[in-house]
Structures are given as structure tokens and as C-alpha cells.
């Protein structure tokens, strides 16, 4: 699965997004 980092450095995984 692809992993991206949002502007806060939180890992965004395919099918499960994590935010603070």
C-alpha cells in the first residue's frame, strides 16, 4: 500500500487516514 505524509508528518495509509 502507498504511504504519504501530510503537512504535519502524519502517515496517510491507503484505506486508513490518521490525523492529529
From Swiss-Prot:
Keywords of this entry: Disulfide bond, Protease inhibitor, Serine protease inhibitor
Entry superkingdom: Eukaryota
Keyword Disulfide bond: yes
Molecular functions per Gene Ontology: serine-type endopeptidase inhibitor activity
Thermal effects: Retains over 90% of its activity after incubation at between 25 and 55 degrees Celsius for 1 hour.
Signal peptide: none
pH dependence comment: Activity unaffected from pH 1-10. Loses 34% of its activity after 2 hours at pH >12 and 65% of its activity after 4 hours at pH >12.
Subunit structure: Heterodimer of an alpha and a beta chain linked by a disulfide bond.
Function: Competitively inhibits trypsin stoichiometrically at the molar ratio of 1:1. Also inhibits chymotrypsin.
Family: Belongs to the protease inhibitor I3 (leguminous Kunitz-type inhibitor) family.
Name used for this protein in its record: Trypsin inhibitor AeTI
Top-level taxonomy: Eukaryota, Viridiplantae, Streptophyta, Embryophyta, Tracheophyta
Amino acid at each position: 500500500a502507498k504511504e504519504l505524509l501530510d503537512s504535519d508528518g502524519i502517515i496517510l495509509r491507503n484505506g486508513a487516514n490518521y490525523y492529529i
